[in-house]
């Protein structure tokens, strides 16, 4: 049609006009310019409308790009010569690689193995010279085995905390927003004891170091100490739900609903409704509680911005620890010394020292830029802190001015836990992932998560259990389930 032909003609004219006024820059190096003797303006293009300063800058940039390509080309030639030398050496030993000659842009398939070996050797040499820099976003080359063993399903709401008993028999404890705490058989996944003494969300659970006593903290502004008696059922063969995964080799799963719960699985197990002791001094939610070494005192952390130290036998308040500017999020005690660390939304964590009975000292640490979700002790002289600022930091108690290692991740971190023997940190994330790092900040593995296994909602807490032969790591989340894992980290991965 006339309209179409006219429009096409107009478009062609406009295109030719733009082309005639386009910048024409001929890139050349200094040697070519010296050989031709042409003036700079002729090399740049007579019809350029750009100012001379802009043209000069462009020429300089193009020159830099050209030099980079020249360097790459030279390196490529050197690599090819190395490969030729390697092939000649192999041929002299009777191990010549067929088709190892190089084409202009590629190598033959069978020569790629030699190239890979050479490339790996170069990478190893480079890494050895730069090993002082730790990047938490780089995975290691060895394989860590992370196997899902058991799922513990029975809570009616999200699970905030998970813990393992320190006395025989070894059982798993979970604290849930459904106002209950449950004890589980690790081997069978059966509920053994249900604690229903709280009238609010149960936010944490910790076990006495030598007796069958549990300590729970709740949104009802109290902490309870209660006794449990468990009788383990006969273990059944564990179904093989394993998926041996290393690093990042798992398949991401889509958002799915929480696991279906047929009936109340905790209705058949014995229920404890009355605590031995109820600690009631807080004016807000009690978010966490823990036993001091020896088990004669406990510490609680609350949204009223205080942490309280209680005597277990008398239930009396011994100390009220004040100083945080916002709500507390967690508390943890040292396994062998009278030390307490408290975490807060004020971006700090505080170290409280009760080793001297006459006075207690406090140190404030400001290493994070967002809520400190947890800070925990290791057996040695380290504290590990995790935060909503997506970092985990490792501190030395002898010099806590700055962290000795920093782990940067892609999601907020919740209640962390450190494996005593292997010194591995388990990081539960808001984004449903669980990652494992060593104390130097090197990532060891990420727990598998697919359409068939793993957490489907935020992971709230992690807990190691080195003494159990089947599961040595437990995680829980807001998908209303706890998961038992078997983690096998090769010794090679832990070598420094």
UniProtKB/Swiss-Prot annotation:
Residues 1-50, 238-267 are annotated as: Disordered. Gene3D superfamilies: YVTN repeat-like/Quinoprotein amine dehydrogenase. GO terms for biological process: corpus callosum development; lymphocyte homeostasis. One of its GO terms (cellular component) is cytoplasm. It is found in: Cytoplasm; Nucleus. Disruption phenotype: Mice lacking WDR37 have reduced absolute numbers of circulating T and B lymphocytes. Residues 247-265 have a biased composition (Acidic residues). Keywords: Cytoplasm, Nucleus, Repeat, WD repeat. WD repeats lie at residues 154-194, 197-236, 281-320, 323-362, 367-405, 408-447, 454-495. It holds the Pfam family WD40. Residues 32-47 have a biased composition (Basic and acidic residues). The keyword Cytoplasm applies. Its main location: cytoplasm. SUPFAM superfamilies: WD40 repeat-like. Residues 1-13, 22-31 have a biased composition (Polar residues). Forms homodimers. Interacts with PACS1. Interacts with PACS2. Required for normal ER Ca2+ handling in lymphocytes. Together with PACS1, it plays an essential role in stabilizing peripheral lymphocyte populations. This is WD repeat-containing protein 37. It comes from Mus musculus. The lineage of its organism: Eukaryota, Metazoa, Chordata, Craniata, Vertebrata.
């Amino acid at each position: 049609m006339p309209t179409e032909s006219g429009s096409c003609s107009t478009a062609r004219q406009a295109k030719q006009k733009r082309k005639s006024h386009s910048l024409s820059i001929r890139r050349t190096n200094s040697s070519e310019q010296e050989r031709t003797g042409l003036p700079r303006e002729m090399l740049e293009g007579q019809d350029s409308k750009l100012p001379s300063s802009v043209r000069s800058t462009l020429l300089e940039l193009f020159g830099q790009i050209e030099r980079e390509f020249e360097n790459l080309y030279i390196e490529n030639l050197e690599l090819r010569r190395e490969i030729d030398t390697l092939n000649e050496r192999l041929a002299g030993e009777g191990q010549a690689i067929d088709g190892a000659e190089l084409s202009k842009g590629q190598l033959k398939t069978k020569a790629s193995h030699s190239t890979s070996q050479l490339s790996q050797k170069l990478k190893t040499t480079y890494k050895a010279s730069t090993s002082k820099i730790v990047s938490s976003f780089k995975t290691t080359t060895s394989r860590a085995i992370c196997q899902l063993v058991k799922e513990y399903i029975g809570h009616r709401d999200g699970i905030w905390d998970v813990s393992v008993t320190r006395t025989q028999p070894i059982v798993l404890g979970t604290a849930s927003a459904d106002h209950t705490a449950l004890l589980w058989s690790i081997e069978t996944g059966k509920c053994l004891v249900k604690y229903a003494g709280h009238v609010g969300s149960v936010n944490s659970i910790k076990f006495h170091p030598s007796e069958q006593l549990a300590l729970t903290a709740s949104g009802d502004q109290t902490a309870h100490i209660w006794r449990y008696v468990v009788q383990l059922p006969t273990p059944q063969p564990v179904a093989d739900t394993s998926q041996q995964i290393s690093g990042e080799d798992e398949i991401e799963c889509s958002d799915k609903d929480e696991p279906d719960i047929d009936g109340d699985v905790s209705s058949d197990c014995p229920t404890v409704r009355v605590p031995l002791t109820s600690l009631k001094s807080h004016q807000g939610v009690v978010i966490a509680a823990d036993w001091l070494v020896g088990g004669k005192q406990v510490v609680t952390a609350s949204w009223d911005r205080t942490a309280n130290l209680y005597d277990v036998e008398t239930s009396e308040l011994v100390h009220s620890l004040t100083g945080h500017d916002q709500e507390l999020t967690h508390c943890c005690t040292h396994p062998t010394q009278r030390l307490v660390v408290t975490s807060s939304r004020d971006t700090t964590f505080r170290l409280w020292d009760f080793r001297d009975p006459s006075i207690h000292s406090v140190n404030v640490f400001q290493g994070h830029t967002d809520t400190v979700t947890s800070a925990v002790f290791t057996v040695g002289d380290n504290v590990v802190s995790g935060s909503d600022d997506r970092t985990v930091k490792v501190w030395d108690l002898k010099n806590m001015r700055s962290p000795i290692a920093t782990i940067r991740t892609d999601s907020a971190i919740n209640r962390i836990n450190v494996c005593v023997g292997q010194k591995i940190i388990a990081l539960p994330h808001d984004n449903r992932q669980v990652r494992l790092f060593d104390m130097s900040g090197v990532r060891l593995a990420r727990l598998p998560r697919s359409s068939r296994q793993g957490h489907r909602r935020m992971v709230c807490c992690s807990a190691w259990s080195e003494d159990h032969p089947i599961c040595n790591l437990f995680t829980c989340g807001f998908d209303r389930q706890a998961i038992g894992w078997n983690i096998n980290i090769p010794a090679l991965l832990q070598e420094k």
